[in-house]
Amino acid sequence: MQKHFKHLFSAITIMMAIVPSAMAQTYPNRPIKLLVPLAAGSTADILSRTIGQELAAITGQAVVVENKAGAGGTIAMAELARATPDGYTIAFASQGTLVFNIALYAKPGYDPVKDFAPIMLVGGVSNVMI
């Protein structure tokens, strides 16, 4: 029993030494790029810049808002899909970029289910088909 306790105590001691080093990594430690798939001055651009300012204030890091308009938003979303999935490149997406483009384009350059993970919901819009 005493031998078993020594091994258990040793394992716990090693784990306690490892955990603080894993937790020491900080995020973010460099600027965050926020891609907007619409033109400058659009509602999405204004919202993303407002969110970017708040995110910068909370994290203490700069948030660079980059407009990548064109091709119904596929240019920005394809760039996001190619980016390293480390949280330093995020995008302002809509139902157009996440749903409609997948149905409209044969090869949009991204798969919204596999390539992206939601962070937050900014707002909602009701659509009506007439």
Feature annotation, model-predicted:
Residues A106, G123-I130:
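Hydrophobic/proline-rich hinge and linker segments of small-molecule sensing/allosteric domains
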Residues M15-M16:
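Repetitive helical segments and hydrophobic/amphipathic motifs
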Residues I12, Q95, G123:
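Residues that line or immediately flank small-molecule/substrate-binding pockets and catalytic motifs
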Residues A24-D115:
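N-terminal (or domain-start) structured segment
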Residues I90-A91, I119, M129:
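Well-ordered beta-strand positions enriched in small/hydrophobic/aromatic, beta-favoring residues
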Residues V19-S21:
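N-terminal signal peptide c-region/cleavage motif recognized by signal peptidases
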Residues K114, I119-S126:
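Short Pro/Gly-enriched coil loops immediately N-terminal to beta-strands
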